[in-house]
C-alpha cells in the first residue's frame, strides 16, 4: 500500500489544528496528493470516536490513529490492519525523526535550578530505557496508573510507540524540522515565527 491508494478516499482522524492534521497533510503533499482536493479528511475530537466511526463504517474505513489506540482497536477487531506507518513514511521524506511529544521547562526555572533539571533528564532517560527494555513491567504500570485499560494492550503497543530520548543537537534538529512543517502549514501554529536557538535546552544554556 502507498499514499496513492488514499486518493479519492475519506480519512478519519483526530487532532484538527494539531500534530495529526499537520503531519498527515505534510505527508500527503510529499506524496503528490492534495489534501484539500484529492481526499476528504473528517476530524474527531477523540481517538475513541474515530474507532467507533471505523466500526460503523466497517471495511471502507481509513483512519489515522496513534498507539496504543491502534493496538486496542486491532485486539477488538482482527480485520483491522496497518497499511501505512506514519513514522516510517516521515523518515522517507525527512532526515529527522517525527516528534509527537516533548518535555518543556521554563527558562527561569532551568536557570535557577539547573541540577534539578539535569537530574530530571537523567531519570527521564532511565524511564525511556525501562519502557523499551522491560515491556512486561511497563505494561503492568500502564494499566495500574490508567494509561490503558489492560496491560495486554500496552504490551503489544509499546514496541511500536517509538519512545526515544533526544537531547542536544540531535533533539534540536528533530524539533526544528517538525516546527518547520508546522510553520509551513500555518505560521500561527508556532506563534507566527520559528523559535531561535534559546528555545532549545542544553546544559550550556543553563550554565550561562
Predicted regions and their residues:
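Periplasmic solute-binding protein
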Residues: 1, 21-27, 98-107
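Immediate post-signal peptide segment of exported/extracytoplasmic ligand-binding proteins
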Residues: 1-10, 189-195
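Bilobed "Venus flytrap"/periplasmic-binding protein-like clamshell domains
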Residues: 3-72
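Short, surface-exposed acidic
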Residues: 35-39, 146-157, 190-196
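Pocket-lining segment of extracytoplasmic ligand-binding domains
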Residues: 49-141
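Secondary-structure end/capping motifs
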Residues: 110-185
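Conserved C-terminal helix/tail region of periplasmic/extracytoplasmic solute-binding proteins
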Residues: 176-208
Amino acid at each position: 500500500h502507498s499514499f496513492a491508494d488514499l486518493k479519492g478516499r475519506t480519512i478519519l482522524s483526530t487532532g484538527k489544528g494539531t500534530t495529526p492534521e499537520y503531519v498527515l497533510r505534510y505527508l500527503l503533499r510529499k506524496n503528490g496528493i492534495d489534501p484539500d482536493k484529492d481526499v476528504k479528511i473528517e476530524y474527531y475530537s477523540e481517538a475513541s470516536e474515530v474507532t467507533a466511526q471505523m466500526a460503523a463504517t466497517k471495511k471502507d474505513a481509513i483512519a489515522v490513529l496513534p498507539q496504543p489506540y491502534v493496538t486496542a482497536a486491532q485486539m477488538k477487531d482482527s480485520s483491522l490492519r496497518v497499511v501505512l506507518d506514519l513514522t516510517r513514511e516521515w523518515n522517507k521524506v525527512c532526515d529527522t525523526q517525527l516528534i509527537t511529544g516533548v518535555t518543556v521547562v521554563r527558562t527561569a526555572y532551568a536557570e535557577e535550578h539547573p541540577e534539578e533539571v539535569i537530574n530530571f533528564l537523567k531519570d527521564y532517560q532511565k524511564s525511556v530505557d525501562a519502557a523499551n527494555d522491560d515491556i512486561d513491567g511497563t505494561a503492568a504500570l500502564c494499566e495500574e496508573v490508567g494509561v490503558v485499560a489492560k496491560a495486554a494492550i500496552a504490551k503489544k503497543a509499546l514496541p511500536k510507540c517509538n519512545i526515544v530520548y533526544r537531547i542536544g543537537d540531535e533533539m534540536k534538529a528533530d524539533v526544528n524540522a517538525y516546527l518547520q512543517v508546522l510553520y509551513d502549514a500555518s505560521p500561527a501554529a508556532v506563534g507566527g515565527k520559528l523559535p531561535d536557538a534559546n528555545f532549545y535546552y542544553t546544559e550550556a544554556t543553563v550554565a550561562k
